[in-house]
């Protein structure tokens, strides 16, 4: 397997968030809601079920304070996730607030695309610099079978509109599944041949609620990787703030392929991201502990020093790697609550 070079950045990018294994954290994944309106068969096949007690998601002011603390400690990139973040009525205000935080250079959005065609112009105006949208199939019927929603054509129009208004690249996510996604690989490759899309195939991950689905549908991304390498695709360098994807390009394609393979050896070695849930808990790993509560330090601006101290101290408890390879997904029953 080819190794991926890491693209080094300047000294002004040095983060104060460094763990025991000398990994540097410049990337925050911020969930703003647990609610999702899709019923994806690999995540929430029965749809979102609200808890019996009313949950209060992070407010604008709380979001502002947590992002400011991370930025002060060297974070440069924030990804707004959910659930489906655009379902929040104040989503545009959230995006604007994050984008206006001193030190934040990229504000990315992960979305199911439900409102993309309608709102993409507003997202851009609010400060969203990068977009990841889920498209698990390019077949209308299959897309509805996977997601429970007949929205494929609208999402594809939203992607086209993003290019029209100046987005230079859109990342498209598809969960790699034996029955659904894998047979469409050629169709996805044809789609990105003349479009600046990074088509990202994400290995299905085992979670508490989806064990049987995982056993039936899991497919290693290595099989896709080997095929692409044989067809002339080449691995690209990674920047410090990039996500976990191994990215491949081909001289005959305008688009790229990204492979996210959490079961691969050393997957965690280049981890650069921390997660804050919509309820204000810091999660050191997607497949980890119950989270470290930050909310008691988000009510006043005067608590910033305490908040930053808690973040730095908590990071020292981050494990070297997850334990997915032995079937341990931690407390994660599904990925909707923390945005994957």
From Swiss-Prot:
EC number: 4.1.99.22
Cross-referenced HAMAP family: MoaA_B
PROSITE patterns found in the cross-reference section: MOAA_NIFB_PQQE, RADICAL_SAM
Radical SAM core domain mapped to chain residues: 20-246
Biological function: Catalyzes the cyclization of GTP to (8S)-3',8-cyclo-7,8-dihydroguanosine 5'-triphosphate.
Name used for this protein in its record: GTP 3',8-cyclase
Any GO MF annotation of the entry: 4 iron, 4 sulfur cluster binding
Reaction(s) this enzyme catalyzes, per UniProt: GTP + AH2 + S-adenosyl-L-methionine = (8S)-3',8-cyclo-7,8-dihydroguanosine 5'-triphosphate + 5'-deoxyadenosine + L-methionine + A + H(+)
Residues the record lists as binding [4Fe-4S] cluster 1: 36, 40, 43
NCBIfam families: moaA (TIGR02666)
Binding site for [4Fe-4S] cluster 2: 268, 271, 285
Keywords tagged on the record: 4Fe-4S, GTP-binding, Iron, Iron-sulfur, Lyase, Metal-binding, Molybdenum cofactor biosynthesis, Nucleotide-binding, S-adenosyl-L-methionine
Xref: PANTHER family: GTP 3',8-CYCLASE, MOLYBDOPTERIN COFACTOR SYNTHESIS PROTEIN A
UniProt binding sites for GTP: 29, 79, 110, 171, 273-275
Organism: Actinobacillus pleuropneumoniae serotype 5b (strain L20)
Cofactor (UniProt): [4Fe-4S] cluster
């Amino acid at each position: 397997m080819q190794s991926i070079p890491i693209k080094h950045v300047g000294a002004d990018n040095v983060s104060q968030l460094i763990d025991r294994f000398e990994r540097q954290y410049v990337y925050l994944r911020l969930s703003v809601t647990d609610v999702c309106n899709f019923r994806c068969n690999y995540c929430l096949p029965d749809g979102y079920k609200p808890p019996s007690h009313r949950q209060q998601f992070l407010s604008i002011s709380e979001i502002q304070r947590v992002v400011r603390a991370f930025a002060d400690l060297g974070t440069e990139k924030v990804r707004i996730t959910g659930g489906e973040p655009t379902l929040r009525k104040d989503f545009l205000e959230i995006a604007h607030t994050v984008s206006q935080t001193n030190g934040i250079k990229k504000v990315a959005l992960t979305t199911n695309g439900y409102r993309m065609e309608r709102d993409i112009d507003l997202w851009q105006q609010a400060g969203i610099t990068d977009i990841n949208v889920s498209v698990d199939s390019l077949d209308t019927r299959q897309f509805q079978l996977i997601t429970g929603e007949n929205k494929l054509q609208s999402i594809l129009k939203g992607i086209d509109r993003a290019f029209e208004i100046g987005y230079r690249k859109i990342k498209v996510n598809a969960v790699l599944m034996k029955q659904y996604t894998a047979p469409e690989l050629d169709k996805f490759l044809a789609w990105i041949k003349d479009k600046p899309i990074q088509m990202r195939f994400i290995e299905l991950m085992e979670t508490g609620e989806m064990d049987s689905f995982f056993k039936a549908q899991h497919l290693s991304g290595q099989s896709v990787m080997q095929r692409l390498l044989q067809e002339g695709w080449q691995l690209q360098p990674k920047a410090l703030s990039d996500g976990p994807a191994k990215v491949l390009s081909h001289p005959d394609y305008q688009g790229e392929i990204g492979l996210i393979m959490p079961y691969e050896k050393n997957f965690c070695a280049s981890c650069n991201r921390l997660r804050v849930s919509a309820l204000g808990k810091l999660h050191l790993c997607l497949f980890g502990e119950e989270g470290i509560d930050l909310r008691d330090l988000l009510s006043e601006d005067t608590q910033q020093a305490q908040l930053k101290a808690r973040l730095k101290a908590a990071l020292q408890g981050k494990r070297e790697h997850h334990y997915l390879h032995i079937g341990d997904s931690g407390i994660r029953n599904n990925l909707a609550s923390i945005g994957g």
